[in-house]
Design a protein with these regions (language model features):
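Extracellular, surface-exposed repeat/solenoid domains
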Residues: 1-27
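Outer membrane beta-barrel translocator domains of Type V secretion systems
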Residues: 26-205, 314-316, 321-326
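Extracellular/periplasm-exposed beta-strand and loop segments of Gram-negative cell-envelope proteins
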Residues: 90-92, 126-139, 168-191, 218-243, ...
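Residues on the lipid-exposed face of transmembrane beta-strands in outer-membrane beta-barrel proteins
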Residues: 99-105, 145-151, 165, 193-199, ...
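Outer membrane beta-barrel transmembrane domains
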Residues: 109, 203, 219, 230-337
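Short, well-ordered beta-to-alpha junction loops that form the rim of enzyme active sites
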Residues: 212-213, 237
Length: 337
């Protein structure tokens, strides 16, 4: 068996009236190089890594309503597994590890309105594997910056806006059928904006419910690259428009005048309205399509353990046909002064 371009071929024979005929017949599936390129050249990995950093306001910063200072420093780490659709019917899995960190300042507009303005940096890395016949793998590194502005109202309303810019370094590798190593790499960049709104309804016993809506747009620059054995890949730009409707239910326990513990449950749906990218591999066009609805649920908590310091953590699971996250764990620390 040999691999030529996107496909593999086996030597077969047939009987003819004038003798035996030998010919190359295409086998099912893709060649090792084709499987690698189709699994790891679409938008899926970068899209999932962006969503991990963006998440929602509560997961990203924890509970921001009960701060005791005007300036804040925070750091958050997370790890998760993604299962994603690639090009040409391929599938990939990736384990992502990331950290974000930031500084913000709380500004009083009047007695009912406050603004939290901040900047953050972020880094993450994904170890990837194509779920196919030949064991292709990859490594995607991401670096980014973001600015955010969060409006809070005394009656529980809030609105959170995030502007982000990211860079991606993608490496991919496999082996041809004869054992020859094959590799490729490309560098891309992306930008996005997100708007989240919601309202917390508080009750006298410390219980609260918080309905949320979020809409985010993300653009990923398409790049061209050639693998070490000559396979050409040409990506179009990718666009994603993701809507989310969710609900948080929790309870706040005051431990003393300056400390509290607040656990919560969350759930909702995300819908990808755009989420497709055209990629041409050796002259053949494929589409990476992530459109569809995904359901999510999770649990988390905030613990104010000192007058100016708080930890927060969350577990979440998301299920969808073309993109899913079997598990995601994050934790953060915020210090105010």
């Amino acid at each position: 068996m040999i691999d030529i371009g996107l496909h593999s071929y086996a030597l077969e024979t047939s009987e003819r009236n004038d003798g035996r005929e030998w010919y190359l017949a295409r086998t099912e599936g893709f060649s090792p190089t084709g499987e690698m390129a189709l699994g790891l050249s679409g938008m899926s990995s970068a899209y999932a890594m962006h969503m991990s950093h963006l998440s929602d306001l509560r997961e990203r910063l924890g509970e921001i309503r009960y701060g005791n200072g005007t300036d804040g420093l925070w750091v958050r780490g997370f790890t998760e597994e993604n299962r994603l659709s690639g090009l040409g019917g391929t599938d990939l899995s990736q384990n992502v590890y990331g950290t974000s960190f930031g500084y913000d300042r709380l500004l009083d507009q009047d007695e009912n309105n406050k603004w939290l303005l901040g900047l953050r940096g972020q880094i993450s890395r994904a170890h990837q594997r194509v779920d196919g016949l030949h064991g292709a793998s990859g490594d995607n590194r991401s670096y980014g910056i973001a600015a955010y502005a969060t409006w809070q109202h005394a009656e529980g309303w809030y609105a959170d806006t995030v502007l982000s810019w990211d860079w991606y370094d993608q490496n991919l590798k496999t082996r041809m059928l004869d054992g020859t190593p094959v590799h490729g790499s490309y560098h891309s960049y992306a930008g996005g904006i997100s708007q989240e709104v919601g309202r917390m309804f508080r009750f006298d016993n410390g219980l609260f419910i918080e309905p949320q809506l979020q809409l985010s747009w993300y653009w990923i620059k398409g790049m061209d690259f050639t693998t070490s054995n000559g396979m050409d890949v040409d990506q179009d730009d990718a666009h994603a428009l993701t809507g989310r409707a969710g609900l948080v239910v929790g309870k706040k326990w005051d431990l003393d005048d300056s400390r509290y513990f607040q656990p919560y449950l969350k759930g909702g749906v995300r819908h990808e309205f755009m989420g497709d990218q055209k990629v041409t591999v050796n002259g053949i066009k494929f589409t990476n399509d992530l459109r569809g609805t995904r359901g999510y649920y999770g649990a988390g908590f905030d613990l104010q353990f000192a007058s100016n310091a708080r930890i927060y953590a969350e577990f979440e699971r998301e299920d969808g046909q073309k993109a899913s996250t079997p598990w995601s764990v994050s934790a953060g620390l915020r210090v105010e002064f």
